[in-house]
Amino acid sequence: QRKMFSRSSLGFFVVNRQTSGDYDFLDPENKYNRVIGIDYNLASADNSWTGKYYLHKSFQPGDSKGNYSGQATLTWQPRRFRYIFDIQYVDEDFRADLGFVQRKGVLKNGNGFSYNFYPKSGKVSLHGPGAMALYYWRPESEWKKIDHTYSLYYNINFTNQATFRFDFR
């Protein structure tokens, strides 16, 4: 991982899971799984812009085209407001044997907005209402929308780093 600009970083990784022998009981498709990736974490000097971006590719026996997973999350947070944009795609054939993949063959898009109040004293460092919308599509099925979530919430952050959130979906 390398630092870029004032507070951002860029990282590369390789994960290799491979059997050490030729076993009769082993399915040939499970002999190995490799994932390579690049991750970028964005943080502006004043912390008003933050983001996380990644692109990963998996390799396994009988590999087909694709096998990608990618995500871009961008947050803009001046003092009182917070806006989040998130988009993620996980190809149907992406496989990470040494990690967790929630949904495959899905494009997820999310947007959120919140307003923050900052008390002058006390145990609460900030609190405020927010809204989030998440949509899920399946590109291989003519971009059919397969799920969505709408959320209204109230978030409370304490000075000891604890967080409490009421969520209505």
Give the ranges of each region predicted by the language model.
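Exposed, low-structure sequence patches enriched in small/polar residues
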Residues: 46-169
